[in-house]
Amino acid sequence: MQLADMEHSTEILYNKTEVFCSAVHRFGSDALLLARFAEPKRLQRAADLCSGCGIVSLEWHDRGHRGECTAVELQPEASSLLREALAAQGI
């Protein structure tokens, strides 16, 4: 599914990283707390399992993580939100 095919909104993180969300795939403060708790070192490889709209991996990027990060999401709509956010920002 393409982002153009679904209704979505854009949330902007502290350092201007954009997160695309939908009515079904959005995030709350618990996801931001998880991202801080599990934050990898700057160049460390990382995995974001059950990534949804990609808030954890995008928060890591926003906070300076530049290592390889693999985000895994089974729901096509959610994974397209992350894929499109990455493409739109050149990440």
PLM regions and their residue ranges:
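Conserved SAM/SAH cofactor-binding pocket of Class I
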Residues: D30-I91
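Short, functional N-terminal and low-complexity linear motifs
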Residues: M1-M6, A47-S51
